[in-house]
């Protein structure tokens, strides 16, 4: 007997092992059948089967599984398997969710039958698993069935493996499984039978299956279909056409395959550069892609239809998706090629072979399907009653809530739904009332769409089927029983009652809003808001608004400081309306729908337009109360659509920094000086608040989680009930956001943050905010900056020959805070230009300038306003005033109007605009135009007129006309706080003579008004009308000019000269091609104008610097001696080709000519002026490193670069001039020697070149020898020395050599390396020669310095052990969103930084204590916020670049050379070294001379270090995956919103045609009813627009988060290397990264604080709304 028992045990163990190891569905069922037969077990005995099996199988491998299952079955909720003892359940579908539900029901004691249509598990598609899902499956013994389950950092599994695993567990716990069985329909009980008669059954195929005779109490649909079970209405979520392709390739498990990194995914909005390169190289256009490695190499991607058509995958284009993707319309061979090519590119061609796996049909495993529409059931369960028999019907899995595949939520949410359903069935078995049961289930179901891995309970051990253990803050009674009465179907209800009851699920707030908010109520509200205003009498919604006063009054009521109502002229209707439109767009984010001119038409404004436009004000300020400052404080909580500035205006302010193209001008905006001063001040406040804040580890993590939670809730609510109040809670507090928010995201756009007067002599004395205390490091800068400014002012004062410049400077120096308000509030007097004779005017101007300078010194805190100065100035002259004429060719243009190209007869020339401020600066780039001067010309600096008030002084003599125009413009600046640009008198005269003063002309009149689409020239109806940059267009017409992709408002860039819009990627390409084209047409030193570009938020003007033939030397001196924080240099626009060809213009200037000086002076500003803010930020954050004064020659820029935003821009970059590249042969330097430079520039007045990423364009043609070329700056320890500048000219062949990464020069010796090391106190990095220590210019010295520079550059490349690997694998610091991509500019980037920052960082040794105290204030936690700069600026050809910015396990190539003696600042940051990532350990540090010394040395703590690295990598990967999924959600939601908007627009167009009688209607339709319908559509459209803005805000936050994570990872990797092994450039790069992180933290801090404030407001409003609803007898619920 003993032997028999032992044999029996051994046999049982072997049979059970066979069952466990089965790899197919059929094999598993067969092994299970054999196991039961051999062990004499009855699988139909569901109650005792598990116990019998556990008793029979006792071998050691099974005991671990029994222990896990026993622990699970021991949960109290199961009541030891008796909770549902008499319940019979049918589950339709054998997917993961169906089996998971079956397991729970079996543990509850229910009889469970699973029917599955197929008998094979063939889907190799990979599922992403949430942490709780992994924990749950492990507790069920997943490792026993599949040993590779989630090994290491793997968090995914193929559907086939998961199904097999769950099938085996289900069989073990007594679930009855039938395959090859198809559900057909429910069979109702016979009507005439007793209570113990036949119950509910299922009709199945084949009919002879035993399941057809079973009766059930519960039926669960889990087959993933949408119509298997009747009674469940569905909500559709339609996005843009989305065609998914899945592909499975054979995984041979080779070493090469194992090394290929998985790709968690890339969303188009997250890494556009990758997709652009993919399209350019392969023609494949994708929106996202994922790669997982399991039994197969699994790829899934979303392809764009046009790409599939172009590649021949889809044969014919059809509108119907079914026909489009029909089998006979798909070329299978092309599809295979398409997917393989995308997979090859995505893995960087690292997979050795891509052979398709074979599916169960014997075909290559690739599929293409449509998921344009996703569906969700409106309810999760219902109860049917027939003949006194009740049946509970429920849905789980995809049948309940279809997932968006890139998110990986299908399995996770499906399991949660399975647990919730099991909980419901337990209540059903215990006799709970059906309505109570359904109401609880619906309450829980409403949480499901918004669940994420972050917002569910983290205590996985406590998870049970009880929802309270899984959902924090669960409210299981938010849906009341009476609200689900329609889900109890007894056959006594008719369809109409069912439909009516279904409406009870709608939000109370929405219903009340729709019943109360009508056009009549809108009119009444407008009347109440505008009463008691002069000239305003609102009696209707059209003619009453014609004058524009009513709109201005409406704005003034809400924000009195925005409009000076008393100064408005009632007769100037167009101006008043345009003013209101501009202010509303700028301050409230309300896009205009028409123009001021059209409002002034005889027929008056269109009523439909006014309803649409005024409704936005109504929603924003409805029943808002005024605070003392006139800001709205509260919002009517009963209005679900009331939302604040947060959604629209906040997003606009965020994107101000994102725009690369400043506008030429805007009306009624702050002056350039004011705006830049405030930006500087705001930056210091943000920076110091960041520095003085406590360590941000916990704080940032909390904020990050809050933001993520807010985003999730927002998206989920929208997903759950598309048009209902899901949007409301995220956007209810718009109107009061300004009053309470601590700091605006972009303080430059908000006049309330204007700084008080900032004197030129005291630029560092800015008033403190309540929240901010100046850092001691900032104080360290004050004396330095003040001394620089004083020195500069004295220098400027000593120049007496050029006076008008100083007058204008003084005007610009006026009070920052008062300039804006005074210009807005004071009445605008008519402009009276004077025309005195030339000599008296100049004499008076000189006298006045001297008086102003003296007064500025004596009374720095009591200066006169601009207006007073202008009045005094005008009083000094005599003569008959010339009456101004309005130039008909330059009509008023709104701030949103697009700046057009400058007329060829009109050329603007610009001079420097001093703006004293501690921090600064709008990037301003310049090109020069060499104009032929007929006589001695004095340069005059004037401020440009606002287009709406530009004057053309009559046809008087040119000199008098110019003087009159000068005074007119000067006086006008008192009321036009636009960006100051400067005009030379020569150009002003030309403008006056031609009758053109406007900088831009209105778009061609042939394009029509606001009802004509600027792109397609077709009619654009009101509801479908969008506006940007003053243009009006259809949504579908708003596309990138290059790639044709759809653009979104706020996420576009605009070229003001060409009148074209671009996406981020192609705007950068546009800049590149523009510079290349300009370079090709340059000739003999003549520079063509740089493109003037603009965006929809920036207001920078185009500034220019003319280069006349004969300029006074004082002019050049004035230009040189302006303080570094005051320089503005820009473009002189010349389009007349005849001028370019003028021999006098093209002739090179003599060495000592003033023209040459002006050229050099102008070029200095081209680089430095863009970078002032950068320099100031660095000096603020790292004062001990960067405070010491140094001087350098300013590089002159041959390359025209575009006017860009300041250093705060998310898209910051600087395009490095060509000469930053070093020729391969230093002998070419002989061709680059410039003429002698007589100019001298004091050190303290030259801004330092800041930390900027560089991009070098290789296509520039060879410039002429007379063209000034940029030079790399030199550094000297002598604080008063001057730097002569030399030209650099490169031939085309030399440029090509520079782009050869494999370039080596064995001729370079180690002696040259030593030369650089000897220049330790002041590293000399020059093009031409060492800098002399005396101020006088010197003749060109020998080539020693330049040769040394070139050698050093070459050494940095040749030292790497593998230059090709360096190109391919080096992380791209300059392109943070595509770290692996190859960037030509990176070749020269580090040397540029070395020339600009190493000298700063090493000007003197720093103590570790000094820097440590500074850096302790910088939050660098691993989970703090992330920030970014744009990665679209440089788009070079792809050179084996890596796949995504989300990669983790990059293997770094060889690094650059390591200079000796560079042991400065970052040596104290060694505490970060233990956090270094695995990349650093894999990085080979070697050079040609000391490779052995550079080898990484393993220490005794190597094992511990590796363990920490693995943990860090896993955590980083997890964080990246979370960001990816959130990005995918945002991307999908944006597409859905766009589709909903398009649907609304179609309805609105049809309705508008009816209202206008364009559809042939006889007019019998009730207009009032139609207007009511129109208004409802308007409200819905406004709501969707706000939601879209909110989604873009969250996308911005996500981008910042991702970038900061990568910056910190890069910093830790670098700090793992000892400082003694680093070169100077590497130390500088570490400093750069640190500053980058600080900037990102600042951005995210602001954004997070604003979003958190918004959340708190919404929470309070929700409580008020709930109280209101309950007090009025409504049942409170959210939908």
Swiss-Prot record:
Residues noted as binding FAD in the record, renumbered to the chain: 97-125, 398
Record's compositionally biased regions (Pro residues): 1333-1342
SMART domains referenced in this protein's UniProt entry, alphabetically: CH, DUF3585, LIM
Biased composition (Polar residues): 874-888, 1112-1123, 1220-1242, 1302-1325
Motif Nuclear localization signal location, chain numbering: 658-679
Disulphide bridges: none
GO molecular function, one term: FAD binding
InterPro entries for the chain: bMERB_dom, CH_dom, CH_dom_sf, F-actin_Monoox_Mical, FAD-bd, FAD/NAD-bd_sf, Znf_LIM
Domain (LIM zinc-binding) ranges: 1011-1073
Enzyme class: oxidoreductase
Biased composition (Acidic residues): 1202-1211
Chemical reaction(s) catalysed: L-methionyl-[F-actin] + NADPH + O2 + H(+) = L-methionyl-(R)-S-oxide-[F-actin] + NADP(+) + H2O
Matching PANTHER family: [F-ACTIN]-MONOOXYGENASE MICAL2, CALPONIN HOMOLOGY DOMAIN-CONTAINING PROTEIN DDB_G0272472-RELATED
Function: Nuclear monooxygenase that promotes depolymerization of F-actin by mediating oxidation of specific methionine residues on actin and regulates the srf signaling. Acts by modifying nuclear actin subunits through the addition of oxygen to form methionine-sulfoxide, leading to promote actin filament severing and prevent repolymerization.
UniProt-recorded name of the protein: [F-actin]-monooxygenase mical2b
Species of origin: Danio rerio (Zebrafish)
């Amino acid at each position: 007997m003993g032997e028999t028992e032992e044999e029996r045990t051994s046999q049982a163990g072997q049979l059970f092992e066979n069952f466990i190891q089965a790899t197919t569905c059929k094999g598993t069922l067969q092994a299970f059948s054999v196991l039961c037969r051999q062990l004499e077990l009855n699988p139909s005995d569901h109650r005792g089967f598990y116990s019998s099996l556990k008793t029979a199988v006792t071998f050691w491998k099974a005991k671990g599984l029994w222990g896990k299952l026993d622990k699970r079955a021991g949960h109290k909720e199961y009541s030891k398997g008796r909770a549902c003892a008499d319940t019979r359940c049918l589950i339709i579908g054998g997917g993961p969710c169906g089996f998971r539900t079956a397991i729970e029901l079996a543990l509850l004691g229910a009889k469970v039958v699973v029917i599955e249509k197929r008998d094979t598990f063939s889907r190799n598609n990979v599922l992403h698993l949430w942490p709780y899902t992994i924990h749950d499956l492990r507790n069920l013994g997943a490792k026993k069935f599949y040993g590779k389950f989630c090994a290491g950092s793997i968090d995914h599994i193929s559907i086939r493996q998961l199904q097999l695993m769950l099938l085996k567990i289900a069989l073990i716990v007594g679930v009855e499984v039938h395959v090859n069985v198809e559900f057909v329909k429910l069979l109702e009980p016979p009507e005439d039978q007793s209570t113990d008669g036949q119950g509910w059954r299922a009709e199945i195929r084949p009919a002879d299956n035993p399941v057809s005779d079973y009766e059930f109490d519960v039926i669960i649909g889990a087959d993933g279909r949408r119509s298997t079970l009747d009674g469940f209405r569905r909500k559709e979520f339609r996005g843009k056409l989305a065609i998914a392709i899945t592909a499975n390739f054979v995984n041979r498990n080779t070493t090469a395959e194992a090394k290929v990194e998985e790709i968690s995914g890339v969303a188009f909005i997250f890494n556009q550069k990758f997709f652009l390169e993919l399209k350019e190289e392969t023609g494949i256009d994708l929106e996202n892609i994922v790669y997982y490695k399991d039994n197969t190499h699994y790829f899934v991607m979303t392809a764009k239809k046009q790409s599939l058509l172009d590649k021949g995958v889809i044969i014919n284009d059809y509108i119907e998706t079914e026909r489009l993707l029909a089998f006979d319309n798909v070329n299978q061979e092309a599809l295979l090629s398409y997917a393989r090519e995308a997979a090859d590119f995505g893995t960087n061609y690292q997979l050795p072979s891509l052979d398709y796996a074979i599916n169960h049909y014997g075909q290559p495993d690739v599929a293409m399907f449509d998921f344009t529409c996703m569906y969700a059931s409106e309810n999760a369960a219902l109860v049917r009653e027939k003949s006194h028999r009740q049946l509970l019907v429920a849905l789980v899995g995809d049948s309940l809530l279809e997932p968006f595949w890139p998110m990986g939520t299908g399995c996770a949410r499906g399991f949660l739904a399975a647990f919730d359903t099991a909980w419901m069935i337990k209540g059903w078995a215990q006799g709970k009332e059906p309505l109570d049961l359904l109401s609880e289930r619906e309450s829980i179901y409403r949480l499901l769409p918004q669940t994420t891995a972050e917002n569910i309970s983290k205590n996985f051990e406590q998870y049970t089927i009880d929802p309270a253990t899984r959902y924090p803050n669960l409210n299981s009674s938010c849906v009341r029983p009476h609200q689900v009465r329609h889900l109890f179907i007894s056959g006594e209800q008719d369809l109409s009652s069912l439909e009516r009851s279904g409406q009870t699920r709608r939000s109370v707030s929405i219903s009340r809003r729709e019943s109360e908010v009508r056009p009549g109520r809108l009119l009444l509200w407008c009347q109440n808001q505008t009463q008691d205003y002069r000239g305003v009498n609102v009696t209707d919604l059209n003619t009453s608004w014609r004058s524009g006063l009513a709109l201005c009054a409406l704005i003034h009521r809400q924000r009195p400081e925005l409009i000076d109502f008393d100064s408005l002229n009632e007769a100037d209707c167009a101006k008043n309306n345009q003013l209101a439109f501009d202010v509303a767009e700028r301050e409230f984010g309300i896009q205009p729908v028409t123009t001021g001119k059209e409002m002034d038409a005889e027929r008056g404004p269109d009523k439909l337009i006014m309803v649409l436009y005024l409704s936005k004000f109504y929603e924003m300020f409805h029943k808002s109360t005024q605070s003392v400052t006139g800001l709205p404080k509260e919002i009517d909580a009963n209005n679900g659509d009331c939302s604040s500035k947060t959604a629209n205006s906040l997003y606009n302010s965020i994107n101000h920094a994102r725009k690369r193209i400043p506008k030429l001008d805007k009306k009624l905006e702050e002056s350039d000086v004011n705006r830049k001063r405030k930006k500087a001040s705001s930056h210091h406040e943000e920076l110091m608040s960041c520095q003085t804040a406590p360590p941000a580890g916990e704080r940032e993590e909390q904020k990050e989680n809050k933001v993520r939670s807010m985003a999730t809730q927002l998206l989920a609510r929208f997903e759950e009930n598309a048009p209902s109040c899901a949007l409301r809670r995220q956007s209810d507090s718009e109107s009061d956001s300004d009053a309470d928010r601590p700091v605006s995201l972009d303080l430059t756009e908000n006049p309330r943050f204007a700084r008080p007067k900032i004197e030129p002599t005291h630029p560092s004395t800015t008033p403190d905010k309540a929240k901010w205390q100046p850092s001691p490091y900032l104080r360290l800068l004050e004396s330095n900056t003040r001394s620089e400014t004083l020195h500069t002012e004295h220098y400027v004062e000593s120049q007496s020959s050029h006076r008008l410049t100083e007058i204008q400077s003084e005007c610009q120096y006026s009070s920052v805070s008062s300039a804006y308000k005074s210009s807005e509030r004071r009445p605008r007097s008519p402009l009276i230009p004077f025309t005195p004779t030339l000599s008296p005017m100049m004499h008076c101007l000189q006298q006045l300038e001297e008086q102003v300078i003296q007064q500025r010194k004596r009374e720095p805190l009591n200066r006169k306003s601009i207006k007073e100065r202008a009045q005094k100035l005008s009083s000094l002259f005599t003569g008959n005033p010339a009456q101004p004429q309005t130039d008909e060719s330059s009509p008023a243009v709104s701030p949103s109007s697009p700046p057009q190209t400058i007329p060829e007869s009109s050329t603007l020339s610009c001079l420097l605009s001093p703006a004293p401020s501690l921090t600064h600066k709008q990037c301003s780039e310049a090109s020069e135009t060499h104009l032929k001067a007929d006589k001695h010309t004095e340069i005059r600096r004037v401020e440009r007129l606002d287009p709406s008030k530009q004057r053309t002084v009559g046809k008087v003599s040119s000199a008098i006309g110019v003087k009159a125009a000068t005074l007119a413009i000067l006086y006008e600046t008192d009321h036009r706080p636009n960006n100051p640009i400067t005009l030379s008198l020569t150009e002003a005269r030309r403008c006056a003579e031609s009758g053109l003063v406007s900088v831009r002309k209105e778009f061609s009149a042939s394009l029509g008004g606001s009802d004509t689409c600027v792109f397609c020239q077709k009619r654009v109806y009101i509801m479908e009308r969008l506006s940007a940059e003053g243009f009006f267009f259809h949504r579908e017409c708003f596309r990138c000019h290059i790639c044709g992709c759809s653009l979104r408002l706020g996420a576009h860039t605009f070229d003001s000269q060409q009148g074209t819009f671009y996406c981020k990627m192609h705007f950068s390409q546009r800049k590149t091609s523009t510079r290349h084209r300009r370079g090709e047409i340059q000739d003999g030193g003549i520079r063509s104008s740089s493109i003037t570009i603009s965006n929809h938020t920036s207001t920078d003007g185009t500034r220019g610097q003319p280069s006349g033939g004969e300029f006074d030397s004082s002019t050049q001196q004035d230009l040189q001696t302006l303080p570094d924080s005051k320089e503005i240099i820009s473009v002189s626009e010349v389009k007349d080709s005849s001028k370019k060809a003028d021999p006098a213009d093209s002739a090179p200037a003599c060495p000592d000519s003033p023209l040459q000086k002006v050229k050099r002076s102008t070029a200095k500003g081209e680089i430095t002026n863009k970078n002032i803010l950068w320099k100031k930020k660095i000096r603020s954050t790292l004062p001990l490193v960067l405070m010491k004064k140094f001087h350098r020659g300013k590089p002159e820029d041959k390359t025209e670069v575009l006017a860009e935003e300041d250093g705060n821009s998310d898209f910051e970059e600087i395009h490095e001039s060509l000469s930053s590249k070093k020729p391969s042969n230093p002998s070419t330097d002989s061709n680059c020697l410039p003429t002698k430079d007589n100019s001298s520039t004091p050190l303290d007045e030259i801004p330092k070149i800041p930390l900027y990423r560089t991009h070098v364009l290789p296509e520039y043609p060879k410039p002429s020898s007379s063209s000034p070329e940029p030079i790399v700056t030199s550094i000297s320890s002598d604080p008063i020395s001057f730097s002569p500048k030399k030209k650099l000219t490169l031939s085309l062949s030399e440029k090509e050599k520079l782009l050869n990464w494999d370039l080596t020069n064995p001729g370079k010796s180690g002696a040259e390396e030593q030369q650089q090391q000897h220049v330790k106190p002041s590293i000399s990095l020059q093009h031409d020669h060492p800098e002399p220590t005396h101020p006088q210019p010197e003749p060109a010295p020998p080539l020693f310095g330049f040769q040394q520079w070139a050698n050093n550059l070459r050494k940095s490349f040749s030292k790497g052990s593998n230059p090709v690997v360096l190109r391919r694998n080096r992380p791209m610091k300059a392109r943070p969103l595509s770290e692996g991509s190859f960037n030509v500019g990176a070749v020269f980037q580090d040397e540029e930084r070395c020339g600009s920052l190493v000298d700063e960082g090493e000007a003197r040794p720093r103590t570790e204590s000094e820097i440590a105290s500074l850096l302790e204030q910088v939050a660098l936690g691993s989970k703090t916020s992330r920030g970014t700069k744009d990665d679209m600026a440089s788009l070079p050809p792809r050179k084996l670049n890596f796949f995504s910015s989300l990669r983790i396990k990059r293997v770094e190539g060889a690094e650059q050379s390591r200079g000796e003696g560079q042991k400065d600042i970052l040596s104290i940051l060694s505490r970060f070294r233990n956090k270094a990532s695995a990349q650093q350990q894999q990085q080979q540090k070697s050079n040609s001379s000391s490779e052995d010394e550079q080898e990484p040395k393993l220490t005794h703590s190597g094992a511990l270090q590796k363990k920490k690295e693995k943990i860090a990598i896993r955590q980083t990967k997890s964080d990246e995956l979370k960001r990816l999924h959130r990005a995918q959600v945002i991307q999908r939601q944006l597409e859905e919103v766009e589709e909903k908007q398009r649907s609304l627009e179609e309805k609105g167009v049809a309705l508008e045609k009816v209202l206008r009688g364009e559809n042939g209607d006889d007019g019998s339709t009730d207009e009032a009813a139609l207007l009511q319908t129109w208004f409802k559509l308007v409200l819905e459209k406004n709501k969707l627009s706000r939601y879209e803005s909110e989604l873009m805000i969250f996308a911005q936050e996500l981008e910042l988060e991702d970038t900061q994570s990568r910056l910190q990872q890069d910093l830790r990797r670098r700090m793992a290397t000892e400082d003694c092994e680093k070169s100077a450039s590497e130390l500088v790069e570490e400093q750069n990264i640190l500053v980058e992180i600080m900037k990102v933290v600042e951005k995210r801090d602001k954004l997070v604080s604003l979003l958190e404030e918004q959340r708190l407001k919404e929470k309070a409003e929700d409580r008020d709304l709930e109280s209101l609803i309950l007090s009025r007898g409504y049942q409170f619920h959210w939908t």
